[in-house]
Amino acid sequence: MGSSFGDLFRISTFGESHGGGVGVIVEGCPPRLELDLDEIQAELNRRKPGQSHITTPRKEADQVEILSGLLDGKTTLGTPIAMLVRNKDQRPGDYSDMAVAFRPSHADATYQSKYGIQARSGGGRASARETIGRVAAGAIAKQLLRKAAGTEILAWVKQIHTIEAHGIDPSTVSMNDIEANIVRCPEASVANQMIERIEAIGREGDSCGGVIECVVRQPAVGLGMPVFDKLEADLAKAVMSLPATKGFEIGSGFSGTLLKGSEHNDAFIPGDDGRLHTATNNSGGIQGGISNGEPIVIRVGFKPTATIRKEQQTIDSDGNATTLAAKGRHDPCVLPRAVPMVEAMVALTLADHLLRQQGQCSLW
């Protein structure tokens, strides 16, 4: 329970951080889609640990194995696609202290309370390694959306701790801009400040959080359904299911609460393509829970990494007060590696809604 996502384009992830491997089963992908397997691996490379000095030093190749669902290794059959990444660089001994003391603000205590047992080594299903399956499946969803509607999905780091980038234009930012530095902030001068802040906080044995922004350019019109299956509601659920997420905004977000209706409303204007367009995009590309064809713009807040080397007050499994200074290899800031995770969850949501839209509204 709780390890599957989606309705028609549905994924189920499996595996633990220090188990044999992690992976995903993708169901509902349409047949005859020619997949670029290098693109799937490239997305996993963006997510994998050890890619820079501001991420966890754990070394994993994260090489994907596709076990089923493809003809000649590239063409989807319409049957379940199973993908596996084997764990290689495990150090269970780093978690000996955590076997008896709960990490503050981590899932240790709540998993123990719920199940009466937990995978203490590496955090089990609460580890960010669970997201490998999401990113691999999201890479397939990205290719489906691009072929079906010309949709492009890009995310980047907008804020680290108190340092925020203000000069990024969602309509023009490119993948090259985002990947130009290790923090994945397209505003170069701000990126350098972010890197220095992560380094400084990491040296203290501490961690920091921030905000990732994501844009969907050329989304299909009509995605989403009234009331309980609104597109923004499903996007919020998707990205808020990622580890360490604590906040979600779309369009103007909370700043829109400071405007009057006359200031916030997106005036409709005719477009050269024969479609309705809006003069502004405070709605973030979604109105009434349904995509209007304008860029979808969301922001996701991530808390500081819970596992830190700094000594903290906690309790042990018997309820006694103790302290914990975590060992192991952990990200001082999750955001640089979370960028492809956000893109993946957005892609999976849109792919699912695209199939639902086609199934309901394209019969005649």
Curated annotation (Swiss-Prot):
- Output the Gene Ontology cellular-component terms: cytosol
Cofactor binding note from Swiss-Prot or TrEMBL? Reduced FMN (FMNH(2)).
State the InterPro entries in the record. Chorismate_synth (IPR000453), Chorismate_synth_AroC_sf (IPR035904), Chorismate_synthase_CS (IPR020541)
- What EC designation does it have? 4.2.3.5
Q: Name one GO biological process term.
A: chorismate biosynthetic process
Provide the catalytic activity annotation: 5-O-(1-carboxyvinyl)-3-phosphoshikimate = chorismate + phosphate
Task: Output the Gene Ontology terms for molecular function.
Answer: chorismate synthase activity; FMN binding
Which family is this sequence assigned to? Belongs to the chorismate synthase family.
Q: What subunit structure does UniProt give? A: Homotetramer.
Q: What is this protein called in UniProt?
A: Chorismate synthase
